[in-house]
A protein has these predicted regions:
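A short, well-ordered alpha-helix in the C-terminal region of glycosyltransferases
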Residues: 367, 374, 381-395, 404-407
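A conserved mid-protein helix/loop that constitutes part of the nucleotide-sugar donor-binding site
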Residues: 48-55, 236, 240-262, 269-271, ...
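Nucleotide-activated donor-binding/catalytic signature segment of Leloir-type glycosyltransferases, i.e.
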Residues: 281-300
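Conserved acidic donor-binding segment of nucleotide-sugar-dependent glycosyltransferases
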Residues: 352-354, 358-365, 373-379, 394
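N-terminal strand-loop element at the rim of the active site
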Residues: 15, 24-33, 39-46, 63-121, ...
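Aromatic "clamp/platform" in nucleotide-sugar-dependent glycosyltransferases that forms part
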Residues: 301, 320
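Short hydrophobic beta-strand element within catalytic cores of glycosyltransferases
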Residues: 337-341
Length: 426
């Protein structure tokens, strides 16, 4: 709860900022999208948001000046390869000792990110100040935010003349009520806001009905080009990919594998990913307690996940929710059929049940295990769905999705609040 004094200070600061913005607006240049900056929490890590943002940056860099601004630097080099023409800069380098003032600020919690945002623990007063200063130095171009904490700061502090685009990589209904309330108050300030799925687009249209952004569109992620051949679907390997977090549901996948291993002891489950050491230890303990130590393998992170997918025959998704499901498309791009829980919202918008994979509507692990066993038992079905998966993935190539971003950016240069072309809105 804010004290009366703090509320007065905050209102005064925002009032002063509004005055500065009005003055700057008088000198603001015409809308210009030749420069694009993408804000990421940590561009040096691994994960779907990072991979897809880097993929988008590489496409836009063919015709634009593109910079990825990472709020934190957590490694010497990014986990994913940075495409030609893309610069990566950072605001808080956590690989080297900080100065005394930076240490003091870094020990203070963020004042701009709601505690309910999952990035709250990573951001702090130092990242707040450095991000605000970086934004206020901008004079033109486009800035793309990629998560609520960043988006909320962007809507407050982006100066006139800078076009703002918000992106969400998780579902609206997965956010805490307090975070949803902040989104409703602030996201209407965006020049454009993009969701990944049609279902989430509907949620945001409803949530932002009172204060909508100028453009509200759906643009799915594009599947990146991955090393590795199309799978032969002959290896007795089921694969799962993701960080070790409750949302990914690997506890449910291990439980599902009990029934699969009993019926098909010659098949193995390989889980690629990483997370907090205590989460990995809990997952490993679950595997051991289930008697699956030889059947379920924790493989760690792989920078060449396409090669690993090409050596698998089924991709399993046990998530409790998926903002999109980038790894589903990555598996499909290798001709691997997908068996997934029908969780909100991504899987059902990518997978066509019985065509390129199976959607399990029950949330019970046994149902997921039964669906995996069905694809193991029926080789003809596996091959048919694998071939269809390749065709599904082709609709998400960058040469298909990239032009939708180009159309949105072109629309941002158009005066007025007109909606983008239907092809962009999806």
């Amino acid at each position: 709860m804010l004290t009366r004094g703090r509320r007065i200070v905050i209102r005064g600061a925002l009032g002063f900022l509004a005055l500065i913005n009005r003055i700057r607006a008088l000198r603001a240049p015409a809308p210009d999208t030749s420069t694009v900056r993408i804000l990421l929490l940590h561009a040096y890590g691994m994960g779907g948001t990072i991979r897809t943002s880097i993929n988008l940056a590489g496409h836009l860099a063919r015709t634009r000046d593109v910079e990825i601004i990472s709020l934190v630097r957590t490694a010497e080099e990014p986990f994913f390869t940075i495409p030609p023409g893309v610069r990566v800069t950072f605001l808080d380098d956590r690989t080297v000792p900080r100065g005394r003032v930076a240490q003091y600020l870094a020990r203070r919690p963020s004042r701009l990110v709601p505690p309910e945002e999952k990035a709250y623990g990573t951001m702090n007063l130092l990242t707040d100040l450095r991000l605000v200063l970086r934004l206020r130095r901008m004079r033109s171009g486009v800035v793309i935010g990629t998560r609520p904490g960043i988006n909320l700061i962007l809507t407050l502090f982006a100066p006139p003349g800078v076009l703002t685009v918000g992106q969400e990589h998780v579902t609206y209904d997965s956010h805490a009520p307090e975070l949803q309330a902040a989104i409703k108050r602030r996201y209407g300030r965006f020049d454009a806001f993009a969701t990944l799925t049609e279902a989430d687009l509907k949620h945001y249209r409803k949530a932002l009905k009172a204060r909508p952004p100028k453009r509200l569109v759906r643009i799915p992620n594009a599947v990146p080009h991955l090393a590795g051949d199309v799978s032969s679907l002959e290896e007795k390997v089921v694969i799962g990919i993701g960080r070790f977090a409750r949302a990914k549901g690997f506890d449910r996948l291990v439980n599902a594998w009990k029934t699969v291993a009993a019926a098909h002891p010659d098949w193995v489950l390989r889980i690629y990913g990483a997370g907090l050491p205590e989460r990995e230890e809990r997952l490993r303990t679950r595997i051991d307690d289930a008697g699956l130590a030889g059947s379920v393998q924790l493989m760690g992170s792989s920078p060449e996940i396409g090669v690993e997918l090409s050596k698998s025959s089924i991709y399993a998704v046990s998530s409790r929710y998926e903002g999109f499901g980038m790894t589903i498309l990555e598996a499909m791009s290798k001709g691997v059929p997908v068996v997934s829980f029908d969780c909100p919202h991504g899987p059902r918008e990518i997978i066509s049940h019985e065509h390129d994979g199976l959607l399990v509507r029950s949330e019970k692990a046994a149902a997921l295990g039964a669906a995996i066993s069905r694809v193991i038992d029926d080789e003809a079905l596996r091959r048919e769905m694998g071939a269809n998966a390749l065709r599904t993935a082709s609709a998400y190539r960058m040469d298909v999705i990239g032009p939708r971003w180009e159309a949105l950016l072109a629309d941002l240069e158009t005066p007025g609040d007109a909606e983008p072309e239907p092809a962009v809105a999806g």
